[in-house]
């Protein structure tokens, strides 16, 4: 089966769904595909800064984020080793008087639903297996396998890869890395219930960081991060050991509060990848978000 579009976007998370939404609102015929089921979580931090909240307001989606129960953030506290904490109030500006950190299964769903309302054809549980090309070699869409196992060709004038750091679109289009970083951070995080937080809280220690991110359903995300080598060494004694050791060493004041809170999820981990920039466009294709 073959269907034609102006644009097909691969990846229906924040970057891809937003791209599809804006293109559809501008009048383009857009298909949006993602291999994951609709409304699922993904490995991610999700603390939005003012620019992100402003965009949601401009797109008419901020009220839905607020209605989802995401905690309003009106203060950020910075904790430093051997120093007093620094509190910064979030000033009202541009129609935004608070920041928000909605869970990804909440935020992604809100943006995807808005894209559908704008006319985007969304296909979840659709795995991209190949890029299509015309007789000149220009990228001309994607071939996907849908949830029923059927192969479907989605032909498009432009194919947008929004499929993350391991982008299949980037690899198959022949995108090359133009700049490569040398540093990386390994992260562990978990959600806690009934954990009092004044807003965003960031703590900085020796080659490590930690923090609190209030989110939906009265929960707070707690993360720790350090170099990949240090994280690997600590995890030899177990992931829980690594999490608690880093939290106590980096942010003892935060660790005291975590000790009396109730875990609301398992630990999630990210091994760390050095940052990079890829060539973000070519004949018939472009990259957005982490893909580029």
Predicted regions and their residues:
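Helix-loop-beta segment of a Rossmann-like dinucleotide-binding subdomain
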Residues: 84-102, 141, 225-229
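Glycine-rich FAD pyrophosphate-binding loop
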Residues: 24-44
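Beta1/beta-strand and adjacent pyrophosphate-binding region of the FAD-binding site
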Residues: 2-15
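Predominantly flavin-linked oxidoreductase catalytic cores and closely associated redox partners
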Residues: 114-254
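N-terminal FAD cofactor-binding segment of flavoenzymes
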Residues: 43-81
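Conserved Rossmann-like nucleotide-cofactor binding loop
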Residues: 15, 38, 166
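Short beta-strand to alpha-helix junction loop
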Residues: 92-113, 168, 233-238
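FAD/FMN-dependent oxidoreductases across multiple families
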Residues: 235-292
